[in-house]
């Protein structure tokens, strides 16, 4: 099984990826671990693309990948995915979760972050959560994915829907 998890920052993509990876015994790739170098420096695109392509090739039998990053093997990830899960929670819920995550991981690097990228929350990230990361264009992109892959597409808009989805596994 191949599962792509997309959605807004703070919606729980990495947590869900870890759970599904454990549930199905699949390797998990958190896109943030590839996109960033230590200190939240963006990795050169060619390197990032090579790492993702290698992961997909080496795990042809199944995987869980969380993260959007539409320039990095995006079409391939969606084409190959048996399930495309989109987490699109309210902005305030996502902000609350991001703040809680920061409080729990302050000064540490999360498993779903790149080495050397300590958990942080700053004005730029808050703006991303509340506005820039959830524009009408980004939502339209998620809707187009649902139209293109209706049999594989799962939209989850709140915690209750997420819990219902998890119970059905």
At which residue positions do the language-model features occur?
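The conserved Walker
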Residues: 9
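Conserved lysine of the Walker
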Residues: 13
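Conserved substrate/cofactor phosphate-moiety recognition/catalytic segment
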Residues: 18-62
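NTP-dependent small-molecule kinase module
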Residues: 23, 127-169
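Glycine-rich phosphate-binding loop used to anchor ATP phosphates in small-molecule kinases
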Residues: 50-95
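A glycine- and Lys/Arg-enriched "phosphate-lid" helix/loop adjacent to the NTP-binding pocket
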Residues: 89-137
